[in-house]
């Protein structure tokens, strides 16, 4: 089989509150280059690991990992709304194989995904339904959270399944890097409306979604101005993790502890478990016969995130 890895940050703030024009152009050029590589590779199936932000998954039932057998984008921020092109039989087989490997993977025949999936599908693939995609959600916002090691084992199980299928497989990770956006937590929330939104906030009105999005924009504006209680970005931490992923230093990655990650890089740095899972999938699918490269990093306060990208290409006889 042939395999490709593409890991890239996402940001809901793109187009709402942007950094300087040259930075916007730099990131757009990165996305265009990745799309061109993907088009040339022409994957037969895509395995996309990404988080949710209380838009598709809620505290009434929050899995650590969930594979979508049918999935639809909710269309938050400026992402398109509509169905993903999920190959049902393949997704069902993947879920079964991963569970057989000892990973307690949830699955959904009516999965809703947000910008964490949709923005990456558009920017990396060129659209929600351009290629067959198996979407896999990794909980990164609602403690208690699975460990980095469990994310690796999830990815390894997916990669082993993909290797057995053969063909051209693309593994994508969306999320990160260091960031600490104003996502409410059940442990500290006091407003009944906020609590209800994170427990069972499916299908909000357009007005409610717009108000939530405006609060995120306001938080980004304050953060960029240096007038925010949000945790600072941590470029050194981000670069160290990328380096460990590129070298496949699994012992170091397995040693990451959730509380230490939150303290060093912010509560939403756990989105990088998507990168860990996708990289582990690539490693397993190719039996280690692949090359990785760090291709981009910039701390972008306007987007409330360290923005990074890494890629890989390999094959297994």
From Swiss-Prot:
Q: What is its EC number?
A: 1.13.11.16
User: Keywords of this protein's UniProt record, alphabetized?
Assistant: Aromatic hydrocarbons catabolism, Dioxygenase, Iron, Oxidoreductase
Q: In which pathway does it act?
A: Aromatic compound metabolism; 3-phenylpropanoate degradation
UniProt GO MF annotations: 3-carboxyethylcatechol 2,3-dioxygenase activity; ferrous iron binding
What general EC class does the enzyme of this chain belong to? oxidoreductase
> What does the subunit section of this Swiss-Prot or TrEMBL entry state?
Homotetramer.
Give the protein's recorded name.
2,3-dihydroxyphenylpropionate/2,3-dihydroxicinnamic acid 1,2-dioxygenase
Q: Which organism is it from?
A: Azoarcus sp. (strain BH72)
Source gene? mhpB
């Amino acid at each position: 089989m042939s395999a490709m890895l593409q890991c890239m940050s996402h940001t809901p703030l793109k187009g709402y509150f942007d950094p300087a024009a040259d930075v916007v152009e730099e990131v757009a050029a990165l996305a265009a280059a990745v799309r061109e590589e993907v088009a040339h590779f022409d994957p037969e199936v895509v395995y996309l690991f990404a988080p949710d932000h209380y838009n598709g998954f809620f505290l009434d039932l929050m899995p650590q990992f969930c594979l979508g057998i049918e999935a639809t984008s909710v269309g938050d921020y400026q992402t398109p709304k509509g169905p993903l092109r999920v190959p049902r039989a393949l997704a069902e087989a993947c879920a079964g194989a991963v569970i057989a490997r000892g990973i307690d993977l949830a699955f959904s025949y009516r999965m809703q995904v947000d910008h964490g999936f949709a923005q990456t599908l558009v920017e990396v693939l060129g659209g929600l339904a351009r290629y067959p995609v198996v979407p896999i959600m990794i909980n990164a916002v609602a403690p208690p959270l699975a460990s980095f090691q469990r994310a690796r084992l999830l990815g390894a199980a997916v990669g082993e399944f993909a290797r057995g299928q053969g063909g051209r497989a693309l593994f994508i990770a969306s999320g990160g890097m260091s960031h600490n956006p104003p996502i409410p937590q059940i442990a500290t929330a006091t407003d009944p409306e906020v609590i209800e939104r994170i427990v069972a906030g499916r299908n909000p009105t357009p007005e409610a979604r717009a108000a939530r999005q405006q609060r995120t924009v306001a938080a980004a504006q304050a953060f960029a101005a240096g007038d925010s209680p949000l945790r600072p970005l941590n470029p050194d931490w981000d670069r160290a993790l990328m380096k460990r992923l590129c070298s496949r230093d699994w012992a170091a990655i397995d040693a990451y502890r959730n509380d230490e990650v939150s303290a060093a890089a912010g509560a939403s740095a756990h989105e990088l478990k998507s990168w860990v899972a996708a990289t582990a999938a690539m490693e397993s699918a190719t039996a280690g016969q692949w090359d990785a490269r760090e291709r981009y990093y910039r701390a972008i306060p306007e987007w409330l995130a360290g923005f990074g990208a890494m890629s890989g290409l390999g094959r297994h006889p």
